[in-house]
Each structure stands twice: as structure tokens, then as C-alpha cells.
Amino acid sequence: MIQKQKGFSAPVLALSVWTAALAEEMQTGISPRGMIIHGAVQALLLTCISGVFSACWQRAAMQGVWLFSAGAWFLAELFGTVMQAQNICQQEFRSMALIGLLPLLLWAGWCIPPSGWDAPARVLWWFVLLGGLVCLTGLAGQMDWAHLLTADAVQLARWPRVPLYAEYLFWPLLAGYEEPRSMSWLPWLTFLAQAGLTAGMCLVFGAADYPEQELLRAWSADVFSRMDALLLLIWLTCAIFRIGFLCAAVRTVWQRAVQCGKGAVK
């Protein structure tokens, strides 16, 4: 048996998924109604799959497979998040600072215990909520609700692409044993992020055929006209958090693999 220990909290895993979902590239030709209906169906299926995995992962015969798969998947997501954050830094701020900061982030992620990520995650969630409120305030005057009633907005021809993150399936490895079956709802965060972005693009531009940054650039409130830089900085801060968290997740999976190996030897 793997030794029981305190793991990552729900706010930590939720912030990681939310940050990744906001960075997903928008699909063209997806209507708000199609995103809501089809996206909800896919989120429900992913929730069921997550529940099945949470019930089966502790089987001794499969623990090695779960641990290897989780480690490889978290490493892949770590690489992807670094590339996304660096692209934003270079395109929007003409900066390579993230590359210089990366060794420190990886070191911090490896050293900080799972319980140490809860407090910063809760603080960042307040910044995320504040940023969302500021964004809605600046875009409210540009939204045209009639756009939701057009033929393109109500068609259901295409299914949206719902990303699959390692946190959906391997949260039992990260959450410890204190919150059993409590995080199968993580796919709904991705659904809410994608549905909100699609609806916002349709309300402002009439179609969801533009990059997400265009929605931020459309923000205006008399004196300030480039609030997108501040909102992007909030996302970058969350991305830096996710980079450290994914490194900590890899460390946690590695530790559990070592414990599992020792238990098998005994």
C-alpha cells in the first residue's frame, strides 16, 4: 500500500485546469449553442470517465501503468504550458524573461510540498475573478445580444473539441486520500471557460472566428484602452503557477512510484 499523505487541494487542481482551458485555441465555425449543448455532453462523459478512473486506479495490478502514464502526461503538459506562456511573453511583451525564470520555477515546483500550493492558488483565484469582472465591465457596452439569434449562432453542425487534461484522470494520485471522489467535476471548468469565450466572441464580434486576444483588445473604458496587457499578465501569473504545480505533480507521482516499488519488494 502507498503511504497516505496530504495532497493537492481542489483550488490548486481547479486553477491548473482553468489556466490551461483559457489558453486553448478557439475553433472556427463553433456556435455558442453548439458549444453549450455539445460541450455539456462531452463534459458529462469526461466526468463519468474521471469517476471510473478514480474507482479503479488503486488496483495493485494497474498502479504501475497509472503512475507511468501520469508522469509522462504531466511532463507533456508541463512542456506545453511553458511553450504557451513563452509565446505570450514574446508576442505580446517582446520578452524572453520566462526562459530565464524557468530553472527557478522548476526548482520551486520540485521543492514545495503539495500542501504549500493551496494558499497561492486561493489568492490567484481572487485575481482571476477580479480580472473576469473587469473584462465583463469593459465589454458590456459592446455586446449585442441579437448576435446569439443569428443562423450561425444557433447551428449545431459541428462538435467542439474538448481538451483532455491529466488532472481529469489522475487527480486521485495528486489529491491524496482526504478528498475521495471530490474532483470528478474538473471537466466542467473547461466547459465553462470555452463556453464563456465562445459566447463572448459571438456577442462582441458576431462570430467566434478570432483569437482570444482580440476579445481582450476590444476592452475599453474611456481612459484605459489596453487593459488586455493586465489581463494577460494575470493569465501569465496563473501559467507560472501551473508550471510549478506540474513539476510538483511529477515529483509526487515519482515519489508514489518509489513507494509502490518498495511495497512490491516487501
Give residue spans per PLM region:
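Membrane-interface loop-to-helix entry segments
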Residues: 62, 96-101, 106-139
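Membrane helical hairpin/interfacial module
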Residues: 16-108
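Short helix-terminus and kink motifs of transmembrane alpha helices
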Residues: 80-87, 115, 244-252
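Hydrophobic, small-residue-rich membrane helices and short re-entrant helix-turn-helix hairpins
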Residues: 29-30, 112-124, 170-192, 254-260
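Membrane-interface interhelical connector segments
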Residues: 204-228
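Structural signal for the C-terminal ends of transmembrane alpha-helices
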Residues: 48-58, 108-115, 139, 175-180
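Long, low-complexity C-terminal extensions of enzymes
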Residues: 262-266
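Hydrophobic, membrane-embedded alpha-helices of multi-pass small-molecule transporters
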Residues: 5-24, 38-46, 69-81, 98, ...
